[in-house]
């Protein structure tokens, strides 16, 4: 059987319409789905990212950057909305890939989505832990250092006078008491004549708050999707209220002079050469790329398709509605932030504090002075409460992808078990929750964060190309929602996502390829042999490709991805060897995807049976093991020698 055999769309639609005690409970409305999306998208990072993008890249034009990032996100959201309304099944990008790009690609995407949902939930849990510890400190409660963070994380106890002295420089933000030790803190202590060794130092052994919130969210999701949605809705109302309160309290104290110049002149280096991405229009575009990650999360709505009451109507509402709400809020936040304080003052760890302080000074003697004085505490409370809703959506998404993969035979049958009373995929929810809790307790947030970003963007690329291919292979399938200006919008979505992927550090790419290589071994060892496609008839296997149509668009899209990658790295000012390594590893992924798309669109007429060939399983397993061994060797060389030979890792 071809590795690119697709699951019949008609069969997927039929499965989505099944009812009974062993299926997921349909209880979500369009409003529930919208709140799920908002809960996944809005995080505390928006305040930090806005300040950094304004100070380093776009200036006051960060407002335009925010709009551009929203538009780029909308391109991907349109693709998800079309798929979710056409194929309303809980597998998200996995199910869409199965219907268009074939089983092997679908498995890779399903495996990749673990990076987005499970790792994403763990990242949020670690961030939640930090806010809880800080929140408790405001009430005079010091959480034990040994239970604050991942094992080996160092904390230093700073006296109030030293903390105040460090905060005056506004290059880092510290609290009196225990703070995490990092290079920036060491450097700032050196500047004032101190070192870490001058103060008490302790190491953490376990992140207890992160572990506990993961357990709580897991139990909530086992209880029921409607109960989880109601909890999420209440939390989202609190979270958005905090954002709206900042906008309302600050908008009356905007200084219009802070908007001039709206797009600051482009910076130049010591030789007078313009610096790309530092103000000017290039800075506006770079700012949009930085801010884009604040919009990630809307795709999680698609994992709840089989629990929506009317998925064909409500899925596009949930996906696009949540993105629209967040875009409006984000644009207003950026407008207020750069309006109340000069963008030159926002290159600090807590830019929101600078904006609030500037507005509070202007508000002295007014009703808003007390509100603005309380805003740091309110935002911290909003973060503690709000990150809980993000975790709910992330932990909700992963079990439903496992559920779909199990229903297709790619995972064991027990992974698709539904609780007889709550009608939730309780087995995979508990497993996901356990994985998230363990990672939250033992893994550092910096390692988790970038893996989440690259996993999400890779899924965006696949879904964008999948929309084009499905338009070609299944032109007659009913589409309640259609991506406008196809294939232009899907191709632009794939290019934008690939551009942002290419900009992530090379060590993150190495981890992605290693993760995918492990997934390939599992596929050939188990999933290929147990796939339910093997039990379909040869008639169902036949691919009905319209005569006289040549699928040019998907191939053009992949060619543009390859050209974009080459342009991004082949002509940089990096050393020659670094350019070769940077370009080659990224091209490996895109060329592999291109080969799959080519054979899918031009070679599928050869597929007449879904029968399993044991030789394919054996050869595939051997090849995947060799591939994994090779990439382990490459990764070992990379981490041992790359920084030494080329001056650091991207």
What is each PLM-predicted segment?
Residues 205-256, 319-323, 449-462, 489, ...:
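Membrane-interface loop-to-helix entry segments
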Residues 25, 49-160, 205, 244, ...:
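Extracellular loop-to-transmembrane helix junctions
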Residues 95, 102, 133-148, 265-279, ...:
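TM-loop-TM module centered on a large, flexible mid-protein loop between adjacent transmembrane helices
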Residues 130-142, 237-269, 334-341, 460-477, ...:
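Hydrophobic alpha-helical segments and their helix-loop junctions in multi-pass secondary transporters
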Residues 89, 112-130, 290, 295-308, ...:
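Membrane-helix boundary/coupling elements in multi-pass transport proteins
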Residues 30, 153-155, 163-165, 171, ...:
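Loop-to-transmembrane helix boundary motifs in multi-pass membrane proteins
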Residues 202-205, 414-424, 460-509, 520-562, ...:
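C-terminal membrane-solvent junction of multi-pass transporters and transport-like membrane proteins
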Residues 1-51, 55-60, 73-78, 87-90, ...:
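Membrane-interface "cap" regions at the ends of multi-pass membrane proteins
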């Amino acid at each position: 059987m071809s590795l690119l055999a697709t699951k019949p769309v008609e069969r997927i639609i039929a499965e989505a319409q099944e009812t009974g005690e062993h299926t997921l409970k349909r209880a979500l409305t369009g409003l529930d789905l919208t709140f799920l999306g908002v809960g996944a998208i809005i995080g505390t990072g928006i305040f930090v990212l806005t300040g950094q993008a304004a100070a380093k890249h776009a200036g006051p034009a960060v407002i335009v950057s925010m709009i551009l990032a929203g538009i780029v996100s909308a391109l991907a959201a349109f693709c998800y909305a079309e798929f979710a309304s056409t194929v309303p099944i809980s597998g998200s990008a996995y199910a869409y890939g199965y219907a268009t790009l074939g089983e092997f690609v679908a498995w890779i995407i399903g495996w990749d989505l673990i990076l987005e949902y499970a790792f994403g939930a763990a990242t949020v849990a670690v961030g939640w832990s930090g806010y809880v510890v800080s929140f408790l400190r405001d009430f005079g409660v010091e959480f034990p250092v040994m239970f604050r963070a991942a094992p080996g994380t160092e904390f230093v106890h700073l006296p109030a006078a030293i903390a105040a002295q460090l905060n005056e420089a506004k290059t880092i933000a510290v609290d009196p008491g225990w703070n995490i030790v990092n290079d920036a803190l060491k450097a700032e202590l050196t500047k004032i004549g101190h070192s870490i060794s001058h103060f008490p130092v302790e190491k953490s052994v376990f992140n207890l708050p992160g572990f506990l919130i993961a357990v709580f969210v897991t139990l909530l999701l086992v209880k029921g999707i409607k109960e989880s949605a109601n909890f999420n809705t209440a939390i989202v109302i609190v979270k958005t209220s905090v954002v709206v309160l900042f906008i309302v309290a600050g908008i009356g104290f905007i200084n219009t002079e802070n908007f001039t110049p709206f797009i600051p002149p482009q910076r130049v280096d010591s030789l007078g050469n313009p610096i790309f991405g530092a103000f000017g229009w290039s800075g506006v575009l770079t700012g949009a790329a930085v801010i884009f990650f604040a919009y990630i999360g809307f795709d999680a709505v698609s994992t709840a398709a089989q629990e929506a009451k009317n998925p064909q109507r409500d899925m596009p509402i949930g996906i696009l509605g949540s993105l629209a709400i967040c875009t409006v809020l984000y644009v207003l936040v950026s407008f207020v932030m750069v309006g109340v304080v000069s963008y030159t003052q926002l290159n600090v760890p807590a830019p929101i504090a600078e904006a609030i302080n500037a507005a509070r000074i202007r508000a002295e003697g007014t009703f808003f002075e007390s509100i603005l004085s309380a805003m740091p505490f309110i935002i911290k409370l909003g973060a503690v409460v709000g990150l809980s809703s993000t975790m709910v959506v992330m932990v909700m998404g992963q079990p439903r992808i496992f559920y779909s993969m199990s229903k297709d035979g790619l995972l064991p049958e027990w992974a698709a078990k539904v609780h007889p009373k709550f009608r939730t995929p309780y087995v995979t929810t508990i497993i996901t929750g356990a994985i998230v809790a363990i990672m939250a307790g033992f893994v550092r947030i910096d390692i988790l964060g970038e893996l989440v970003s690259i996993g999400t963007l890779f899924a965006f690329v696949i879904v964008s190309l999948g929309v084009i291919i499905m338009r070609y292979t299944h032109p007659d399938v009913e589409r309640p929602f259609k991506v406008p200006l196809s294939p232009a919008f899907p191709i632009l979505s794939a290019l934008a996502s690939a551009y942002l992927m290419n900009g992530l550090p090379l060590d993150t790419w190495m981890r992605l390829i290693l993760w995918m290589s492990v997934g390939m071994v599992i596929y050939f060892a188990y999933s290929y042999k147990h796939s339910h496609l093997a039990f379909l008839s040869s008639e169902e296997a036949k691919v009905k490709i319209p005569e006289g149509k040549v699928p040019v668009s998907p191939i053009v899209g992949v060619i543009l991805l390859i050209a974009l990658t080459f342009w991004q790295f082949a002509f940089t000012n990096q050393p020659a060897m670094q350019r070769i390594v940077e370009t080659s590893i990224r091209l490996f992924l895109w060329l592999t995807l291109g080969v799959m798309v080519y054979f899918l669109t031009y070679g599928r007429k050869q597929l007449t049976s879904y029968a399993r060939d044991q030789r394919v399983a054996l050869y595939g397993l051997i090849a995947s093991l060799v591939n994994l061994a090779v990439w382990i060797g490459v990764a070992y060389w990379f981490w041992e020698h790359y920084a030494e030979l080329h001056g650091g890792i991207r």
